[in-house]
Amino acid sequence: MHDLYEQGDTLASIFEAAAAAGTADHVVQFASTSKITHAGAGVAFLAASAKVLDALDKHLGVFSIGPDKVNQLRHVKFLNGRLSAHMADHAAIIRPKFELVEEIFSRELNGLGIATWTKPKGGYFVSLDVLPGLASRVIAMAKAVGLTLTPAGATFPKGDDPDDKNIRIAPTFGSLDEIHAAMDILTLCIKTASAEQVLGAR
């Protein structure tokens, strides 16, 4: 659904895997339209086995009379029959931003052996790995010159990246000019921190 290109990734079904393993009651999947319509005003939903849904229904019924049915209707009327076209419009806005990140990373970092990164076909993030022990340093260097990045370890449980190497890049919000400047700063910080580490080890 959140594809950047017409041919997105095909994701495996966790429910099919759980059912095949006899653990269907162990999976509860949450989703919302927050990145489809409007953050904070979307429709949330969950999927689970009938047994789990029955148990959740008993608990949730105590907390609320019911969901916001007007908002549900608003979403049905807006998205009915045009969800794919709506998401293609999203992709047209953010795809150039991801392509710019890829262009700058490839130009500035490719072949240096100091960073690797994903080239996603969908979603909202690029996962960047720098040399072990440098993510926090790179983020601090960037912040010192005015670029605020997602904290190191944000993609790990409890925010703890044992290798201190992963940085999550979220290029959807800024303009192309802002992203260009940010990636120029980031790649320079990566090169500088990497050089410091290599020279310090000699």
Which residue stretches match the model-derived regions?
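Conserved core segment of the aminotransferase class I/II
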Residues: 19-95
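Conserved glycine-rich beta-strand-loop-beta hairpin in the small C-terminal domain of fold type I
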Residues: 91-102, 114-129
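Short, conserved active-site loop motifs that form the nucleotide-linked donor/cofactor pocket
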Residues: 27, 115, 147
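PLP-dependent enzyme catalytic core of the Aspartate aminotransferase-like
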Residues: 23, 144, 160-202
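Short, solvent-exposed loop/turn segments at secondary-structure junctions
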Residues: 1-3, 34-37, 50-53, 71, ...
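Conserved PLP phosphate-binding loop immediately N-terminal to the Schiff-base lysine helix
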Residues: 1-15
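Conserved C-terminal alpha-helix-loop-beta "cap" of PLP-dependent enzymes
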Residues: 57, 128-168, 176, 180-181
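Short beta-strand segments
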Residues: 31, 45-47, 119, 125-129, ...
